[in-house]
Amino acid sequence: MKKILAGCLLFASALTFAAPSHISNVRGYTLDNSGELISFSNMVFDGGKVIAIGGSELNERFPNATQIAGQDNVLLPGLIDAHGHVMGLGESLLQVDLRESKSALDAVKMVQAYAKKQQNLPWVIGRGWNQVLWPGKAYPTASLLDEYVNNKPVMLSRVDGHASWVNSKALEIAGITKDTLDPPGGKIVRDNQGKPTGILVDNAIDLLYKHLPKTSENTLTAQLNAAGEQLLSEGITSVHDAGIGKDVYDYYKKRVAEHSLPLRIYPMIAATSPVLKQLLKTDHVQDQYDWLSIRSVKAYGDGALGSRGAALLNPYSDDAENHGLLVTREKDLKPLFDLVLGHGFQLNFHAIGDKANRLALNQFADSFSRIGGKSLRNRVEHAQVINVDDIPRFKTLNIIPAMQPTHATSDMNMAKDRVGADRLKGAYAWQTFLKQGSPVAFGSDFPVELSNPFFGLHAAVTRQNRNNSPDSGWIPSEAVTVKQAFRGFTLDAAYAAHQENILGGLTKGKWADFILIDQDVFAISPQDIWKTQVLETWIAGEKRFTKAP
């Protein structure tokens, strides 16, 4: 069992120590701001910030410090997930989880069991199915769902969030029929008679969203607390929240004013927000203790590879009539980029397919030439399948690829089918980016993938799944070293949020955000990195999580 310390500790309590704190007898690692790996056995922090790292000589320098026994555990900076969905994670923890389903039938039985336990809920909502892992690999249908739950609407998001599986009741409520047109950037999957089958892809999901029950503040509280509890237990002390609406924007501001955020959050305002212009005019949001920083916008280029929604320059190798979907129309890119960059906000653009990536790079170049914004550390979120000629442009344009290592190990079972061997030369190209000097910010894209950052570190270094398959790793030339992976989850993730001077390491003056873990990831076999257990998580010198014995 795990024990989470109260997430609503006052931030001030982290800043009013009577004496410095000194943790000793640790195997500590951090990167300095130049990227050099430093090892240490002792660390002293005061007022929530690191004041020294070193060896036993710190005992003489700080004789009155409060002593903390490190018990020879490994100490690392708190890990940063550079792309996750905080409320989505909390929501998934409170809904039916279909990631372990072995077939469509297995999934509907899980949904039925959940619906029976939650009879008071007006909708049955879940997430995590992946037809690629099921026999036949075909999309499931509304008719199958109807056999098990037909008295209330059901909405089940695919593992990547880019498709939803719904029952007939949900289609009826949304008014989706044979005559309903596909919305721009979306697709209603139909049978050979044109009738909706129960699968909605990308923007077609919006036809259903407006009918979902409104999210209350109590629901937001439950979601944030559940997500925070899990992330702290996995060693994550800061997360870049990839796409929030006005309700969550206001809620985060309320929680930070109450000194009750469970971890540091760097939210990206969703470009689809109806009040985007209003929020941009309010300027950046930054609290004095660096728990909340809002200075970026998440825009949406295309869908996902698994659902064949990623926008490709040439058709899918396994679907010759399909180029994928542009979620934001090409003609809308210029005004959107100009708006965001013109207000001095970092623009983080979701692009998975090579067409979406090229369009993003083209528009960044155009907007930079006219209104500036090149220094804002703009990002491409995912940057998964890229034409090899476009990779150097990331460096030229100062665009940070924000990438998720476990996407590669999850997608390796279908990526070649989708795009063919030739296009894989520019896919999941972490080492290529690093060799050209591009900082790579690593994350997980939770709840699409599991949030555990040690799963990401393992995938980045081995290019294997947690069964250590394939033997030599998938496209092993793009694997990174442990140090490079560590940097992607610390210093470079902090850099991607303009926070490298306060987070991402444990050098003097940075916040004392750190974790104790049970094994040395720099010394063990890379295949075992994913097994790492977090023993303690600290933020600003306050312990926020302890793993129970």
What residues fall within each predicted segment?
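Short, conserved secondary-structure segments in the cores of folded domains
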Residues: 33, 41, 502-505
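N-terminal signal peptide c-region/cleavage motif recognized by signal peptidases
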Residues: 13-14, 18
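Beta-strand-rich structural segments
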Residues: 27-29
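Acidic (Asp/Glu)-rich catalytic clusters
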Residues: 256-259, 283-292, 373, 394-396
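His/Asp/Glu-enriched, well-ordered alpha-helical/loop segment
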Residues: 338-347, 355-378, 382-383, 388-392, ...
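Divalent metal-binding segments
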Residues: 20-24, 35-280, 295, 299-356, ...
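Non-cysteine beta-strand/loop elements that form the S-adenosyl-L-methionine
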Residues: 291-309, 398-409
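Sec-dependent signal peptide recognition
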Residues: 2-8
